[in-house]
């Protein structure tokens, strides 16, 4: 991912595919200190630009905290890899990725288009 962070890139993937991406925030891996700094409000300006760009395409459910949302818009998550794979192949793909990248995780799923491009849960 480049500077659009997880939500920005998910937003672009969803629009480009005409589908809805469901992000399960509890499954997104972070560096241990990231939460602490975001909770104190230490965010780069790019996080606010990313929010401005994508937030109309994001529906937040299940009381996802503002801190979690901030982290998911944070461009410092750059360098990650966002992949969409068939659900039937997800576990096998994850196991293979985790051999090289232990923190790799399934962070969501894709459905046909719903009320918005991204559903953040």
List the predicted regions and their residue ranges.
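Glycine-/charge-enriched secondary-structure boundary and capping motifs
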Residues: 1-121
């Amino acid at each position: 991912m480049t500077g659009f962070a997880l939500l920005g890139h998910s937003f672009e993937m969803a629009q480009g595919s005409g589908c809805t991406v469901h992000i399960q925030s509890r499954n997104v891996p972070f560096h241990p200190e990231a939460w602490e700094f975001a909770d104190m409000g230490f965010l780069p300006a790019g996080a606010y630009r990313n929010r401005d760009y994508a937030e109309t395409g994001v529906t937040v459910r299940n009381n996802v905290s503002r801190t979690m949302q901030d982290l998911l818009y944070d461009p410092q998550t750059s360098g990650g890899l966002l992949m969409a794979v068939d659900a039937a192949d997800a576990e096998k793909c994850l196991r293979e990725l985790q051999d090289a990248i232990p923190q790799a995780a399934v962070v969501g799923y894709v459905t046909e288009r719903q009320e918005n491009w991204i559903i953040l849960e």
